[in-house]
Structures are given as C-alpha cells and as structure tokens.
C-alpha cells in the first residue's frame, strides 16, 4: 500500500445492535447469545437504510447473534459481506450474565457497587473481564480493523460496552469517568481513524428511528440504576 494512502483517515460507522428482550428487562447479556426482538429487527432494517449510501467497503461484526443480525440487514442493503470478529464481543460479565441489575445488586451488593462506580480493575466472578482488560481488547481490535482500510468507510456492528470504549478512546477520557453520553440500540456513531488514533465526529445518531432508542445501561449519569 502506498505510504501516502496509509495516512488517509478511515471513516468508521460504529453501530450498536438492535434491541433485544433482555435489553428491555435490563438483564445482562455479556457473551450470552440473545437474538433481536421484533423491535430490534425493525431497528436493524432502519439503520441499514440509513447507511446504505455511505459507501461502506467493509462490514465487521461481533459474532453474537444480536450484533450479527443487525449486520445482516446492513449487508443486504449494501451488498457488502460480513466479516465476523470475536474481538468485537460485549464485555464478559461472568456470573452477572443472565441476571437483571436489581438481581445483581441483591445477590452481590459489594461487587455491584464496584461495577456501578466503574472500578477499572473489577472483574465479575466466573471469568468476567475488568473494564481495563475489556477496553484494551476493544481498542486494539477496532484499531486493527480501521487501520486495514485507510481512505475507506467501514461499519463495525457491536455492543454498548464496545461503543463506550470507542467513545472514551476518541475523547481521551479516563475509564472511571462517569458516563453522560448515550449508547442507544441501533444508534450510529461516527469516528475517524488515523495513525494517531480515533477522533469523534458524531455520536448516538438515532434520527432514523421513531422515538429514539433504548439505553438501558446502569452507569450513565442520571440513569435510574
């Protein structure tokens, strides 16, 4: 690849998967393979239509069903094949997976408090990932994928936690900093990638959805949990 092309920025459309029943229930999915619900399938079709004319040359997706189903809609709209990458999976939540926020608070109150306060070193029991380990994974994978497409536009379909990591990387924010930005289902998040890293262009675009999108995370400033 010519050296001058290597310096060209990559446009990244980072897209969170559509809604699932467990999103509605505030039940932790993590690495569990939960499909989109009917609304999520509709959201996937809407986000696909929204990005169909963006000139996407590559689609990368988490292998988990909720992300892959969203990617399939985008692939149908653009004619671009999907490349699955396990590095784009959601954070591994160990024993928290399958439980609601309230159930976690009742079963593991001390661990739940460390999680809610974004302790970077806290990892849920049962092979869960700490925020620091998860962040390093997400940024490394996203950097590898974006660096392979200088001067192009790519789509990464992934999860709320991955979107949060990309926002923090692009904004140079501390991992423990409280979250005030949205991570809505089927939202479009726009970044540029250069050899210097990621830059934020636009965030949480849900203009293609009627009535916005669900952000059920428990760590956002002003959230109920």
Residue spans of the language-model regions?
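Short glycine/proline- and acidic residue-enriched helix-loop micro-motifs
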Residues: 111-133, 225
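Short glycine-enriched, charge-decorated loop/helix-capping segments at active-site entrances
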Residues: 27-35, 99-101, 120, 217
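Active-site metal-binding loops of divalent metal-dependent hydrolases
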Residues: 18, 160, 206
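Loop-to-helix element that buttresses phosphate recognition and phosphoryl-transfer chemistry
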Residues: 19-74, 124-139
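Phosphate-coordination/substrate-recognition cap region in phosphate-metabolizing enzymes
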Residues: 2-7, 46-113
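Short, hydrophobic/glycine-enriched beta-strand segments
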Residues: 11-17, 157
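Acidic, low-complexity terminal tails and accessory targeting/binding regions
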Residues: 1-10, 93-105, 147, 152, ...
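General small-molecule cofactor/ligand-binding pocket signal
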Residues: 13, 83-85, 201
